[in-house]
UniProtKB/Swiss-Prot annotation:
Name listed for the protein in its UniProt record: Protein RESPONSE TO LOW SULFUR 3
Gene Ontology biological-process annotations: cellular oxidant detoxification
Source organism of the structure: Arabidopsis thaliana
Keyword Coiled coil: yes
Organism superkingdom: Eukaryota
Coiled coil as UniProt keyword: yes
Pfam family, one: LSU
């Protein structure tokens, strides 16, 4: 075999190496596709959870605002009663004097 035969052998070895490497890359690509699908599914689950949490937070904000308004009304009512009782007490003291 001359130089020509040597080149054919090297080329055949290179082709075989390229085929082997191509197979490895295809397997890696399939694995990456699987990982990407898993990540996408996890992202969808996380987005749905975020939406539920935002909805719950909005409900809690409304509830806390309602409670704050109720407490404020109660405080105003009690302050008014205290004021009236104080005024009544002063009137009793003045009339008894």
């Amino acid at each position: 075999m001359g130089k020509g035969g040597g080149y054919v052998t090297v080329a055949a070895e290179e082709v075989e190496e390229l085929r082997r490497r191509n197979g490895e890359l295809e397997r890696e690509m399939e694995e990456m596709k699987k990982e990407m699908v898993q990540l996408w599914r996890r992202t969808v689950v996380a987005e749905e959870a975020e939406e539920r949490l935002c909805s719950q937070l909005a409900e809690l904000e409304v509830e806390s605002l309602d409670q704050a308004r109720d407490y404020h009304s109660r405080i105003v009512f009690l302050m008014d009663q205290i004021s009236r009782l104080s005024s009544s007490s002063l009137e009793v003291v003045v009339t008894n004097s």
